[in-house]
């Protein structure tokens, strides 16, 4: 399997997973034009689309792509039924695409129906987890998002986090505002800054490394707890997550 990315809009990535025969699955095509261009250039044969949630920048290109490739199956949660999904999927489902088994799990928070697709080592997590951050809570609660992140955090160390936006630099700046002396975060900041100066993408990221630099995955880390305790005493990791998310919302 080969992982490819197509830039879209200002900071989106549309992921395309291909096999050796050129058959492919397209993840969250927010617009069709760049996908059609890449398909023509690489002579890919689209077999399926994965949708993680219903937001327009993730589903906007589905109907046009289906006009060109009507044989495709479009997998998505119930909230994407009116956005082009032809096969509804949910928590615990498994599907076979490109000869590989993908496991679905619900990750409510950003939206209530958000799902992720996992076939080791690839995790297509939409707007649930970003490098250095997590999605805004447009529909769900902090508790729901925390539990969703813990599902991701339980995956193998070598999981490749294929999220949908290039938010890494801004997220790491936020992390440094909370833990300015953290060596891992500072090192990652230098690396990410250099990549972005060169207009290079910072994704995908390996979960093992993400656990070191993403504060939203470190809610039981003593350094972070001590920092939060300077402002407020929060006993539960979910409460510390909510505190972080609130801080990020106004950063």
Swiss-Prot record:
Reaction(s) catalysed by this chain's protein: an S-(2-hydroxyacyl)glutathione + H2O = a 2-hydroxy carboxylate + glutathione + H(+)
EC number(s) from the headed UniProt entry: 3.1.2.6
Biological or metabolic pathway of the protein: Secondary metabolite metabolism; methylglyoxal degradation; (R)-lactate from methylglyoxal: step 2/2
Coiled-coil annotated residue ranges, if any: none
PANTHER family: HYDROXYACYLGLUTATHIONE HYDROLASE (PTHR43705), HYDROXYACYLGLUTATHIONE HYDROLASE GLOB (PTHR43705:SF1)
HAMAP family: Glyoxalase_2
NCBIfam families associated with the record: GSH_gloB (TIGR03413), PRK10241.1 (NF007597)
Protein name stated in the entry: Hydroxyacylglutathione hydrolase
Species this protein is from: Salmonella gallinarum (strain 287/91 / NCTC 13346)
Gene name per UniProt: gloB
């Amino acid at each position: 399997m080969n992982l490819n990315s197509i830039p879209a809009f200002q900071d989106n990535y549309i992921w395309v997973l291909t096999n050796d025969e050129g058959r492919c699955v397209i993840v969250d095509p927010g617009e069709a034009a760049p996908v059609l261009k890449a398909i023509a250039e690489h002579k890919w044969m689209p077999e399926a689309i994965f949708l993680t949630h219903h937001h327009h920048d993730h589903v906007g290109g589905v109907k046009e792509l289906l006009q060109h490739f009507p044989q495709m199956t479009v997998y998505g949660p119930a909230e994407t039924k009116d956005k082009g999904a032809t096969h509804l999927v949910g928590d615990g489902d498994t599907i076979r695409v490109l000869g590989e088994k993908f496991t679905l799990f619900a990750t409510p928070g950003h939206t209530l129906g958000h799902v992720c697709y996992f076939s080791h080592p690839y995790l297509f997590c939409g707007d649930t987890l970003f490098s250095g951050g997590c999605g805004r809570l447009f529909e769900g609660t902090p508790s729901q998002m925390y539990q969703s992140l813990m599902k991701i955090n339980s995956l193998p160390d070598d999981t490749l986090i294929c999220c949908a936006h290039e938010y890494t630099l801004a997220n790491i700046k936020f992390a440094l505002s909370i833990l300015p002396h953290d060596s891992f975060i500072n090192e990652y900041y230098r690396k990410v800054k250099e990549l972005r100066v060169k207009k290079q993408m910072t994704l995908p990221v390996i979960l093992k490394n993400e656990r070191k630099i993403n504060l939203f995955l470190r809610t039981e880390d003593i350094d972070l707890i001590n920092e939060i305790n300077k402002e407020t005493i929060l006993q539960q990791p979910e409460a510390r997550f909510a505190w972080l998310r609130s801080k990020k919302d106004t950063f």
